[in-house]
Amino acid sequence: ELLQIPDNYKVLLMQGGANMQFAMVPYNLLNENETASYLDTGVWAAKAEEEARLYGKTHIVASSKPDAYRYIPKTFEVPKDSVYLHVTSNNTIYGTEFFEDKSYDVPVVADMSSDIFSRPVDVSRYGLIYAGAQKNLGSAGITMVIIREDLIGRSARAKSKMWDYGIYAKNNSLYNTPPVFAIYTCLLTLRWLKKLGGLTAMEKRNKAKAELLYAEIDRNPLFKGHAVAEDRSRMNINFVPVHPEDEAAFLEFVKPYHIHGIKGYRTVGGFRA
């Protein structure tokens, strides 16, 4: 209801987190002699591409790695023989995010683990969406997959039942005992989102919060943002001190204000709000 998912899609609930989907997507969609395209926008996108190599060929359409993943590549070509294009809609470590649901000549597979339900999404523009619940949806232990029905069973390989999207679809995600409490926490979150006014209202709230933080980062001469302005994430606001030696002092400074856990990822440094 919140995502207005079309009737020709199945919603699957399973365990394993997004890391398992890095493998399950190519396992279910990609044959050994075929190619899947990947847009490299950060560590998680790179991990997904690495897993796909176990099941077929991969092609990286573009990468922002040479510029420390500070932006999302906009200009690239997707080979028409690609089985799918994989994108990571929000990059937690580097603070970049997609804000458009773009269509391509091939099905788009999106890892939306860290921005699902943060804004309205046109599900019809995707072949498959997956999201680990622990960021925006519920507690750890459950992963949501939204898959277009014609993609179920696409790969010809013999499949383990526990790794077969078709098995989950046929059994309403009840092939084995599901993580009931984790699913229940998702239900509570979805009810809360609906009560707030849905995803349009949530997007408005997220924009307001992010703009407030980014305005201070841009104003304050002690800090600078990591991501380029047009690709700045609303989910993960990454910033670094202009003088790296001030990092430890700032972490100590904010403790009396009950601000904890904002230390940035080791490859970027700085802070992450």
Description of each model-found segment:
Residues I237-H243, I259-A273:
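Conserved PLP-binding active-site segment of the aspartate aminotransferase-like
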Residues A52, S63-I116:
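Active-site phosphate-binding strand-loop segment of PLP-dependent enzymes
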Residues N8-N33, S37, A45-A46:
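Conserved beta-loop-alpha segment that forms the PLP phosphate-binding cup at the N-terminus of a helix
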Residues A133-Y214, V228:
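Active-site C-terminal subdomain of aminotransferase-like
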Residues V109, V123-Q134:
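Conserved active-site segment immediately N-terminal to the catalytic lysine
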